[in-house]
Regions:
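N-terminal helicase ATP-binding lobe
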Residues: 1-408
């Protein structure tokens, strides 16, 4: 039994007040600097909505509470957790327009605009979507309106006040870290509209901190090689889609080789890029052990992306000799396998042979390789062209479980 159940209302109000004050004190929308404090508040608030514990509490609006918790996680860079917290909710569940707009942004637009019953909310959501697709002034206009409403203290009720206060912070975060802003700043010469339109279908409005860090490190500007180390599930796959799109936009005649040293990974990539290609207008083919090695030259000529294990590509290399100079980008996935006694030799040998061809750029990906700078230098890149992030989309807890004996 929770010690504060007899004063549950007071404790909950204290949590809301604490959240409000932390956000208000945070300058320049740098909410990540207050992560530890805000996570504690979010975890305490989540207790009020958990199925196991919510029966202990009465008088708490659990729907709104979920939104507040999701907002905190969104602001500190845990968008995946925020989306999970809101799963099963509907934009029309919320009683104020600011709360509905918070839901729309934090969930990545996880609703059909035509399903939004409140016309003002629908209009605001359309303004945000229009900004994402065109880069117009809609976001600035909407942000100015919300800030002015908050400053002039014009609210319908207490819920409207609190939700507007949260929306101010959500809009500030969104304005700073949305896809359109980050991509245009990193590469203003590329038309990102189709890529952003595809991202909207995946309910993605912004990059994860690890992805944004890689872009700011030069992912979209490197000349020869860029190496990226980030934990599993931190967004490496989305990074490859981004770079493939940029490469084909910059050079429509380019070909891209995606080296996946595991057959299971090759099969997974084959299915994924078949779907991605339909959205981004490129074709892909895959060759790997267990699949056919006979690829019609016309089909290969048509394909913009070739997915292969290093071993399979080396078998086909002689028949692909004329095609080799067409590859302008090579993506090296699971790069830590270069150190594998079984697969590393073939992987390293193939990369050594490809390095002799001028004009090829390399994106090297790994979750755990320790000497990422040295690998990037070996590929011909600079030591600075490296993205190294320890960000994970959700915290990981490690524990030892023992039975009958003491591990210590």
């Amino acid at each position: 039994e929770y010690e504060f159940t007899t004063r549950q209302g007071d404790f909950y109000i204290t949590l809301l007040n604490r959240m409000y004050n932390i956000l208000r004190e945070t300058e320049n929308a740098e909410y990540e600097t207050r992560t530890e404090e805000l996570v504690k508040v979010a975890k305490a608030m989540l207790v009020y909505s958990e199925q196991v514990s919510e029966r202990n509490f009465e008088g708490i609006d659990k729907v709104s509470n979920h939104l507040y918790v999701a907002t905190v996680y969104f602001l500190i860079g845990y968008e995946a957790i925020a989306s999970c917290v809101l799963r099963g909710r509907d934009i029309n569940d919320y009683g104020t327009e600011p709360a509905q707009l918070i839901y729309y942004i934090v969930s990545g637009g996880a609703c059909n605009l035509r399903e939004i019953k409140n016309k003002k909310t629908e209009h605001a959501a359309r303004l945000l979507r229009s900004f994402m697709l065109s880069g117009n002034n809609n976001l600035q206009d909407l942000s100015t309106f919300i800030e002015r409403k908050y400053e002039t203290f014009i609210f319908d009720n207490l819920d409207d006040f609190f939700d507007t206060a949260l929306l101010v912070h959500v809009i500030r975060k969104f304005a700073k870290h949305n896809l359109r802003n980050i991509l245009t700043e990193a590469d203003p010469d590329t038309d990102w509209t189709d890529y952003i339109r595809y991202s909207l279908t995946q309910h993605i409005f912004s990059f994860l901190p690890s992805q944004e860090n890689a872009i700011r490190k030069g992912l979209l500007k490197f000349e020869t090689a860029f190496s990226l180390k980030m934990p599993t599930s931190a967004g490496k796959s989305y990074i490859t889609e981004l770079l493939i799109y940029q490469e084909l936009r910059t050079n429509p005649h380019a070909k891209i080789l995606y080296l996946a040293p595991l057959r299971s990974l090759s099969r997974e990539l084959k299915l994924r890029f078949k779907k991605v290609g339909r959205h981004l207008s490129f074709t892909s083919r895959a060759i790997y052990g267990g699949s056919t090695f006979t690829i019609d030259q016309d089909i290969l000529e048509e394909a913009k992306l070739l997915i292969s294990t290093p071993e399979s590509f080396m078998v086909m290399e002689d028949s692909l000799e004329e095609q080799l100079t067409r590859f302008s980008l090579v993506i090296c996935d699971e790069g830590q396998l270069l150190d594998s006694l079984n697969r590393g030799i073939s992987y390293e040998l193939l990369l050594t042979r490809l390095k002799r061809i001028e004009g090829i750029r390399y994106l090297f990906l790994s979750a755990i390789i320790p000497n990422i700078e040295d690998v990037n230098t070996w590929l011909g890149g600079r030591k600075n062209d490296v993205g190294d992030s320890d960000y994970r989309p959700c915290p990981i807890k490690l524990a030892n479980i023992s039975r009958g004996f003491d591990l210590a």
